[in-house]
UniProtKB/Swiss-Prot annotation:
It is found in: Cell inner membrane. Keywords: Amino-acid transport, ATP-binding, Cell inner membrane, Cell membrane, Membrane, Nucleotide-binding, Translocase, Transport. Gene3D superfamilies: P-loop containing nucleotide triphosphate hydrolases. Transmembrane segments: none annotated. Residues 4-250 form the ABC transporter domain. GO terms for molecular function: ABC-type amino acid transporter activity; ATP binding; ATP hydrolysis activity. It catalyses: a polar amino acid(out) + ATP + H2O = a polar amino acid(in) + ADP + phosphate + H(+); L-histidine(out) + ATP + H2O = L-histidine(in) + ADP + phosphate + H(+). It comes from Pseudomonas aeruginosa (strain ATCC 15692 / DSM 22644 / CIP 104116 / JCM 14847 / LMG 12228 / 1C / PRS 101 / PAO1). Pfam families: ABC_tran (PF00005). GO terms for cellular component: plasma membrane. It is a peripheral membrane protein. This is Histidine transport ATP-binding protein HisP.
Length: 255
């Protein structure tokens, strides 16, 4: 059984088709990197996976459960059962480019919030879980009472990763998690993500970090103008690209 199956996703904005039949399958422990130029549809695809963007067609299955959908008035798909959507989203934790932490909550409360209010965990258990995952991403206890504005960008993104981990999801989705960081802070976030990959966590990430993608991925997808132009193992995609578009992309992005 796959941890995540996404089949034939289409997304349009008016007459502009951003995604044209993109599919992905992730088994337990897979790390799938999605690469491509800006505007290729990478982030839109990831947001369609957990219905932050509503696709116009396609199927999404997490484990043994397929998201039930119905046609919307504007040609998009809508969740047929909001409770099922919430349940599936809780199994698909997402880490965003711009952290998306709650500015009015402390670090600890940011991580505790969803386990308590979505998973209905006992608060004491949620606090213990939050502290466990904050320690896992290298944030000391003294940080937990601070607010996001008091942290560096790298620290904020590590809090966001701890928040995602606290949901103990089946799959973690990363949407360009380092692109908003100063260059000197990128390494600390990539180190945490590499540790997660080495633990066997199932991850789908959109990234511009080509060396990192080559190192940690089990599978790489090159997206171009809303379609999968090429995919394969890291050695195939980075070492022996078949598509001229992929060769051009790598020539401009490999460091």
């Amino acid at each position: 059984m796959y941890s995540l199956q996404v089949e034939d996703i289409h997304k349009r904005y008016g007459s502009h088709e951003v995604l044209r039949g993109v599919s992905l399958r992730a088994g337990k422990g897979d790390v799938i990197s999605i690469i491509g130029s800006s505007g290729s549809g990478k982030s839109t695809f990831l947001r369609c996976v957990n219905f932050l963007e509503k696709p116009c067609a396609g199927h999404i299955r997490v484990g043994d459960e397929e998201l039930r959908t119905r046609p919307g008035a504007l040609g998009e798909l809508r969740a047929a059962d909001p409770r099922q959507l919430q349940r599936i989203r809780s199994r698909l934790a997402m880490v965003f480019q711009h952290f998306n932490l709650w500015s009015h909550l402390t670090v600890l409360e940011n991580v505790v919030e969803c386990p308590v209010n979505v998973l209905r965990m006992n608060r004491d258990d949620a606090v213990a879980r939050a502290r466990h995952y904050l320690a896992k991403v290298g944030l000391a206890e003294k940080v937990e009472r601070q607010y996001p504005c008091e942290l560096s960008g790298g620290q904020q993104q590590r809090v966001a990763i701890a928040r995602a981990l606290a949901m103990e999801p089946q799959v973690m989705l990363f949407d360009e998690p380092t692109s908003a960081l100063d260059p000197e802070l990128v390494g600390e976030v990539l180190k945490v993500m590499q540790q997660l990959a080495e633990e066997g966590r199932t991850m789908v990430l959109v990234t511009h970090e080509m060396a990192f993608a080559r190192q940690v991925s089990s599978h790489v997808i090159f997206l171009h103008q809303g379609v999968i132009e090429e995919e394969g193992t890291p050695d195939q995609v980075f070492g022996a690209p078949r598509s001229e578009r992929l060769r051009q992309f790598l020539a401009g992005n490999l460091k």
